[in-house]
Amino acid sequence: MKSLKGSRTERNIMVAFAGESEARNRYTYWGAIAKKEGYVQVANIFEETANQEKEHAKRLFKFLEGGM
């Protein structure tokens, strides 16, 4: 595979990685608030969504490292 280093594609993947990471942090934060307020089921949904965002970020990072 051709190297992504310095390409627009590499920049786009890095932006996507940052977005997935930020989304995970938001969902984790909102989940903690929901749990604190007693909305356990809502907190679980936020936690599951945060885990999905984490997996997306891991795949993007792995791709940048040449692991895919």
Each language-model region and where it sits:
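Non-heme di-metal
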Residues: M1-M68
